[in-house]
Amino acid sequence: MIIIEYFHNPVCPYCPAAKSLLTKVIEGLNDIELINVDTYTEEGITRGVSLNLKAVPAIAINGVVKLTGWPFEAEDLLACINEAREK
């Protein structure tokens, strides 16, 4: 199982586009668990700090931040997912 954490906040202008792309990429992939992390919550702040997160939107895969900021492409995300599958 691959765990993807999607870091976002309600004032980020790029987060909706990142979420849309992420949703499309992982649609139909049965080995993915998606966790939405709102960095405007205490829990989200704590998790972001634990990963040394500097910006949103961001995507962590299996506990490692792989993509930060916008834009990123579907190919970038798929490459990160495939890398996680190989481990």
Model-derived segments and their meaning:
Residues E43-R47, D76:
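Short acidic active-site motifs
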Residues P13-Y14, Y40, K66:
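Glycine-/small-residue-rich active-site loops that bind phosphorylated ligands and cofactors
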Residues M1-G28:
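Local sequence-structure signature of Cys/Sec-based thiol-disulfide redox active-site neighborhoods
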Residues D31-G44:
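Thiol-based oxidoreductase modules, predominantly thioredoxin-like and allied folds used
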Residues I61-K87:
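Non-catalytic, surface beta->alpha helical segment in thiol-disulfide oxidoreductase systems
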Residues V49-A60:
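Structural micro-motif
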